[in-house]
Amino acid sequence: MNTQLQQILRSHNDLVTTHEQTRAGFISFALEKNRRSTPYIEEAKSLKELASRANNPEELLNIKEIRRALITASGLSDKALKYFTEDDKVRAVAEMIDNFLKPAGNGFIDELVYRFLLIRGDSLGGTMRNIVGALAQQKLVRCFISTLSVMGIPFTWYDGKSWHIGDTRTPNIEEAKAISWANDKGHRVLAFNLTIKTVNKNVDICLFNANERTFDNNNIAKNCNRSAIMFGELKGGIDPAGADEHWKTGNSALERIRKSFSNVGRDDLQTSFVAAAIEDSTGREIFSQLTDNTLSFAANLTASKQLVSYCNWMILL
């Protein structure tokens, strides 16, 4: 275990997510979910107002402004629509009217709104499952650039198309796809979610001995056997029930990375693991790998001291 880690991790218990951290994580997720649900609520309000022009369920079909909402309420997702003809869509709406809106009597408009929200809510649930990783990445990026700023290190950041001068006050800078800076050892680029050709898999956290030019708009991932410095796994889910599975998949990915790069003579490649949900048994395994240097660094995403230390370690690596 490196000296920096020894200062913040005395035992596996320091890695374990506390009850307070878990609760705070769930609250943060709930607030984000509420924020993202606002457009759906507003859509439902508009739907109710426009649908109120109809005196009976059949007349809803004559209100062209709500046609898309009727299709949604019938249970057809945006993803499914491309497989349906116009006749299929009309049939789906007609079946909803016959089976659910007509039996609702005078409450058919409320029934329509409920069904619209039900489908939208299901869509939101899927979106939130996908957004967990993005939120974790944004938290890491925000901590990373803040640490760079405190250390007085100039940096640039990549938005997926071009590079920009780094400024912590830039709106949405936490959505950066890559960050470039220099330390005493040379130029560095930290990038996220790249498909590394050597492994032939997506890697969450990628640190290269590179600059903006050699990063080459993510093309460095096609041949980084020499430039790769460190790869890491990032798991943002806060639910303790998923902690063991997060570690299993993350550990498996890291083992595959180490083996792939060892095959090209890179036994010196470093690896890291960062997660929001770390339970006792998982913490023991992670700490064991840190102790025997299988794993180079690990941090709990909910522990600010560990996260800052992790960022500081990467900056100087």
Where are these regions (language model features)?
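Generic local-structure boundary detector
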Residues: 37, 51-52, 61, 71-72, ...
